Amino acid sequence: MMRKAVLTLLALACLLLDFENLEATAGNEDRILVVAQHMEAAFRKLEDYTCDVDQIFYQDGAENQRYLFKFYFKKEKKIRVDFYQPHSGLIIFYHDEEKEATVVPLRLLSGLKFRLSVDNSLMKTLAGQRINQTDMGYFIKFMFKNLRTVEQKETEFREDNERVEFLFWAWDYVEEKSAEKYRISISKKHWLPIRIERYNLEDRRLEVTDIRNYVLNAHLEDKLFVP
């Protein structure tokens, strides 16, 4: 009799734990959705922005390559990237819906230009990300899509007065073929990401991107995006 009562209590305890885990997961998904909605609303108000990006790629858990660049964006999807490291002086220009981007290898030799397909391997990051997948509008759509289609397994959500940080499960950013984890930090000042860490399912670090010095709605001139 006593054994049966103990087993019943254990079963109830397990059910309660499962319920709490489901509730926590659902709660985190709801909170991440609210963050994504804040980001979407903030992005709608943007006409342009610039930021400094420090992007590190890892191989076998160790730092492999590092890229430093300034990113310019103007609606509707005009993009300019000025590299500091490596390829100092290299500039990439891209306009929405175009199948090619313009590359200026050296800032001082602006007359020297190349047109390359956005699918060219030279125009992709080490993770395979294309130039037309680099703006915040694309990233926000990526978040909404994966909130609808991917279960948010682990529960990790932290918030203070300045930022929100959470663990986000998603298909890979580029081809959507392999599952990955992202640890994302969002500034509550402008509701844009300030740090994105990417991991595989074995918790091996793949990529870390720090985004700093946002300047929003600076009325960037169109000529800035002309090669």
Feature locations, PLM:
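Positively charged n-region of N-terminal signal peptides that target proteins for export
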Residues: M1-A5
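Bacterial N-terminal signal peptides
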Residues: T8-D18
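N-terminal leader/targeting segments and the immediate start of mature chains
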Residues: L16-Q65, K77-K78, V150, E154-F157, ...
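A generic structural motif
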Residues: D54-Y58, D82-Y84, V104-L106, W171, ...
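Solvent-exposed loop/turn segments connecting transmembrane beta-strands
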Residues: G61-E63, G89-L90, E176, E202-R204
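An acidic-aromatic
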Residues: K70-Q133, R204-E207
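Gly/Pro-enriched, hydrophobic low-complexity segments
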Residues: T125-Q129, Q133, G137-P227
